[in-house]
Amino acid sequence: PASLIARCFIAAHDSDSGVERWRVYTAAGADDPGGVTWGDLPTAKRVHVSPWGLPGSYDPELDLLYWGIAVPLPYTRIARRGTWDVGDRTPCELYSNSTLAIEPDTGEINWYYQYLPCDDWDQDFVQERTLIDTVVNPDPKAVRWINPTLRGTAEERKGVGVMGEPGGL
């Protein structure tokens, strides 16, 4: 029911006391960085952009959590915004259909990558992030789904795999 639809979040709790240490909302609020990507939609209506209850992944070398985030509701732009025209589409409706890299001590978003801005097709990107150590030199002509900012250097450690179709780096 519509009464159960809410703004989603990821939270960390103290393992001894159970007290919440931080909370990061998975849809940028009106006053948050990235909030303008939702247009005039009130923060309370930026819903269902969820991690689905799936676990995140942790990189101990970089001390980062990686979490996959789902689609917004309703499923089409016209239902969410009342129009198909959303202007500049990239990024759009952050942090839907994204990977979030989160600082585990503070809950701050270190970086994000949005796979499908302004999703109208219910294309979830929430599966666990598979962390790999490898050097890649991607050719965007040969690999359909690839982060165009990746470059083949040993220093680059922002490669996070989303396995399955339409998975990619």
Regions found by a protein language model. Give the residues of each.
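Extracytoplasmic
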Residues: 5-7
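Short strand-connecting beta-turns/loops that link adjacent beta-strands
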Residues: 61-62, 166
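Extracytoplasmic/lumenal domain signature
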Residues: 9-42, 46, 78-125, 132-160, ...
